[in-house]
Amino acid sequence: MRGYLVAIFLSAVFLYYVLHCILWGTNVYWVAPVEMKRRNKIQPCLSKPAFASLLRFHQFHPFLCAADFRKIASLYGSDKFDLPYGMRTSAEYFRLALSKLQSCDLFDEFDNIPCKKCVVVGNGGVLKNKTLGEKIDSYDVIIRMNNGPVLGHEEEVGRRTTFRLFYPESVFSDPIHNDPNTTVILTAFKPHDLRWLLELLMGDKINTNGFWKKPALNLIYKPYQIRILDPFIIRTAAYELLHFPKVFPKNQKPKHPTTGIIAITLAFYICHEVHLAGFKYNFSDLKSPLHYYGNATMSLMNKNAYHNVTAEQLFLKDIIEKNLVINLTQD
């Protein structure tokens, strides 16, 4: 009997060792069973990405799905935070908006490229005259943000867009900017953002109260193109990468990550290699261009009370110097 128990114990130890080697030694990370059905869109790699040490969880599915978003929120703690980094008091808004979307898939069903090489394209004026368009278009995944245009700037920033992050005040409203091959991702910071999306999808009159500037009054994208970003991604950017406090002093406005840092965080979860373009700012000349498009100058950046640009620049400097990412617009 004793020998039988010893054999069972040794078998258990061996099984644990094998599983440990499979799941961790090859960097194919453990994922919760509730998410398994959504994992087939992220091809595992045999080597760790350079930035692996920055993340507590790996291969996290970044988009909310109507069928299980509450389970995912409970699993990763988003049910313990209010917007913008959770959904504790806004779950019904999320449910209604998600019910009108057609998909929460990450990549196209025919996209089976493993270990994706991605570029996150910021909107910085440093992209002017860099002629990086062809280089940018060569990546497996191209992530853009807000209303940074491609049309008319193809030589500088390329033509293709895989993902574009937006919020109601920053989304395109002119149909000439719609690429049917682009997936657009709502980053919700307040319940009004979800209500706005729901009203647009239902064809209702848009309530513009509660926005810091007038949001788009029409939606140029089809429901199949739209996703809602899991607040966990934004929370990771704020607390894990930028190390923002969870409670700010009463005399300070809370700081939130810019869309650019959120986009980089998204890339960390879905890509094996991440390159950046357009994330360098010229603070020494406040008259220098803020974006690669338009006439805005760097002086506007200093007036923004809701972002900690200094913390973000230090974070970018750190991950670039440590070769966790590659900067295409480094002078």
Swiss-Prot record:
GO terms for cellular component: extracellular exosome; Golgi membrane; membrane. The gene is ST3GAL6. This is Type 2 lactosamine alpha-2,3-sialyltransferase. One of its GO terms (biological process) is protein glycosylation. Ubiquitous. CDD domains: GT29_ST3GAL6 (cd23984). Pfam families: Glyco_transf_29. It comes from the Eukaryota. It is a single-pass type II membrane protein. Residues 26-331 are lumenal. Keywords: Glycoprotein, Glycosyltransferase, Golgi apparatus, Membrane, Signal-anchor, Transferase, Transmembrane, Transmembrane helix.
